[in-house]
Amino acid sequence: MPKGGRKGGHKGRARQYTSPEEIDAQLQAEKQKAREEEEQKEGGDGAAGDPKKEKKSLDSDESEDEEDDYQQKRKGVEGLIDIENPNRVAQTTKKVTQLDLDGPKELSRREREEIEKQKAKERYMKMHLAGKTEQAKADLARLAIIRKQREEAARKKEEERKAKDDATLSGKRMQSLSLNK
């Protein structure tokens, strides 16, 4: 073990915050218990105890309704903060009769991006072949320059060949003339 013990690591529990609804429910439960204890201490006179018991039963019905509502409400910080995380939504199961097989299939983000990339590449190649892109225009201009240079070189070569032929012919004529003399 290194000097000074282990490093890092989270110690302690994550904090849990109680919502205002939860605090209210706890306070009401404590008050209810206090009332019940007081009623038990006072004694159970039959005539005097009946209205209190009826009131107590009504209160307990209301508290049960409140507890049901409380269970439906979100606990902790979830009640205070609206969370809209699509990954967190539990997907409901569907019956086979409810499935829509004819509807358009939704693609994932990666698949959509891949298809868009391929389509963009195809569009670019079409425009490139038509000579409408900057790169195609530059290529065509370069090819035109090269074509002109080759034509000029071929023309010069042809002129040099003709000049050479003329020189050889004129040289032969001179020789033949000089021989004839």
UniProtKB/Swiss-Prot annotation:
Biased composition (Acidic residues): 60-69
InterPro entries given in the database record: Casein_kinase_sb_PP28, HAP28
Location of Phosphothreonine modifications: T18
MF terms (GO), sorted A to Z: RNA binding
Glycyl lysine isopeptide (Lys-Gly) (interchain with G-Cter in SUMO2) cross-link, chain position(s): K52
Keywords: Acetylation, Isopeptide bond, Methylation, Phosphoprotein, Ubl conjugation
Biased composition (Basic and acidic residues): 30-59, 102-117, 151-167
Residue positions, PTM Phosphotyrosine: Y70
Positions of post-translational Phosphoserine modification: S19, S57, S60, S63, S176, S178
Residue(s) carrying N6-methyllysine: K126
Ranges where the record places region Disordered: 1-117, 151-181
Residue numbers carrying N6-acetyllysine: K132, K164
Skewed-composition ranges (Basic residues): 1-14
Pfam name, any one: PP28
GO BP term, example: signal transduction
GO cellular component terms given for this protein: cytosol; extracellular region; ficolin-1-rich granule lumen; plasma membrane
Biological role stated in the UniProt entry: Enhances PDGFA-stimulated cell growth in fibroblasts, but inhibits the mitogenic effect of PDGFB.
Family according to the record: Belongs to the PDAP1 family.
Protein name from the UniProt record: 28 kDa heat- and acid-stable phosphoprotein
Organism, scientific name: Homo sapiens (Human)
